[in-house]
Regions:
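Pepsin/retropepsin-fold aspartyl endopeptidases
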Residues: 1-226
Length: 226
């Protein structure tokens, strides 16, 4: 079965209504956040409350990697739409230009893809929740061209709201080079990313510029032109 959801974009976050539940789509979240999981997994309710505080007070839950493991999910940010297919059904971006294997994370459950950034192939976490800024290790980011700054926010109250200085870096996608801005994450988050075997996180830099198909059943991520 294939379903198409209208998406609300709130502070860049992608939110759909699924069976009457307001659901934030976050590939950076290792599990789904719903009533069942909140009763058995410590910390999930606090994570949801944090997201209600800085994204949308009407949120009921998250689609995390549990959901993606069972489905193929296509993001069309410009049309404010999300298409979802069961494992046995096919969906595809309209004009595919690049396909990446989804690599295994060393420690934490993550969607990791190899991308050529600043002339070097690097492992990056695809995180649909990275909707304000993309991030990369400071030693790489600062080789780019300064591109202003933005404010981002994290549901952990110990991190909260913080300023992010941005640097444009060249990223090769489908035989073309695209300038994408990257910032530097707070040290604790950057350390967690590196423990996964990656050097950074990319989200908004992809789905604002391309349709994105996350096909976990077939271990691939496909980009398509708008």
């Amino acid at each position: 079965m294939v379903k198409i959801f209208d998406a609300d974009l709130i502070k860049g976050h992608i939110i759909v209504t699924d069976n009457g539940k307001r659901t934030l789509i976050d590939t950076g979240c290792p599990v789904d956040i719903n009533e069942n999981n909140m009763q058995r997994i410590p910390g999930l309710r606090q994570h949801l409350e944090g997201a209600r505080g800085f994204v949308d007070p009407t949120l009921d839950g998250f689609w995390g990697l549990e959901y993606f493991a069972r489905h193929k999910v296509l993001f069309d940010y410009r049309k404010k739409a999300v298409m979802v297919a069961d494992q046995g059904d096919d969906i595809m971006v309209v004009h595919p230009i690049a396909e990446y294997p989804l690599l295994r994370s060393i420690v934490n459950p993550r969607l990791i893809i190899p991308m050529k950034i600043a002339g070097v192939e690097r492992k990056m976490v695809f995180d649909s929740g990275a909707c304000i800024a993309n991030y990369i290790t400071e030693s790489i980011a600062t080789t780019g061209t300064e591109a202003g700054s933005v404010f981002d926010e994290h549901p952990d109250p110990d991190i909260g709201r913080y300023e992010v200085k941005l640097f444009n870096l060249p990223v090769e996608i489908g035989g073309e080079t695209v300038e994408i801005p990257f910032g530097v994450q707070p040290a604790d988050i950057d350390r967690d990313v590196q423990m996964s075997g990656a050097v950074g996180v990319i989200g908004v830099g992809l789905y604002k510029n391309f349709q994105v198909l996350v096909d976990c059943p077939n271990r691939r991520l496909v980009l398509g032109r708008y």
